[in-house]
């Protein structure tokens, strides 16, 4: 499958088989992640691969979002000692997000299912991981990628909508709006 087909095929998989993923495949996902671009080649990322069911369950109990039955998870973190400083200090979020997208695409190309669950900037979501994963304060968990063999199939798609595309400059137009999620507006 070519890259465009892989992008359309990539979907958030929420149901996984109990079958474990070989360590070599998990390392291939990390190698794909580190092929992502970073601002000034800073590479501020750290990856924690978790295959221990007890640890996965504890993380699922403590984090706010996503509680999936995948046999593996990759916690993608930004290391502030490696991140840029000054007005571009938050570029680590973009860098690590690009790495996560590479993991998702690589997983799809390998017939694995995956889903990205965001942690940062919701402190109540990422803070519990510090103790569980022995993280130093300068390492911030950005997100979790659950990975496994899919137990569900979803049709390939794109969410392209020409109402969100502009040529040369932004124009005021009527857009679809999203209902406010009161869960996060407290």
List the predicted regions and their residue ranges.
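Acidic, surface-exposed loops and disordered segments
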Residues: 1-186
């Amino acid at each position: 499958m070519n890259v465009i087909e892989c992008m359309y095929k990539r979907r958030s998989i929420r149901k996984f088989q109990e079958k474990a993923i070989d360590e070599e495949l998990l390392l291939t996902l990390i190698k794909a992640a580190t092929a992502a671009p970073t601002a000034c080649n800073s590479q501020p990322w750290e990856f924690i691969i978790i295959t221990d069911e007890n640890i996965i369950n504890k993380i699922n109990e403590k984090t706010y979002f996503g509680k999936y039955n995948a046999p593996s998870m990759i916690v993608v973190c930004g290391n502030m000692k490696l991140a840029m400083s000054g007005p571009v200090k938050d570029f680590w979020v973009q860098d690590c997000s690009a790495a996560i997208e590479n993991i998702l695409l690589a997983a799809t190309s390998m017939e694995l299912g995956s889903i990205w669950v965001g942690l940062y900037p919701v402190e109540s979501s990422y803070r519990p991981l510090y103790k569980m994963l022995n993280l130093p304060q300068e390492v911030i968990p950005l997100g979790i990628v659950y990975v496994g063999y899919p137990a569900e199939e979803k049709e390939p798609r794109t969410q392209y909508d020409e109402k969100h595309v502009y040529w040369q400059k932004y124009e005021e137009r009527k857009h679809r709006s999203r209902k406010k999620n009161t869960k996060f507006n407290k």
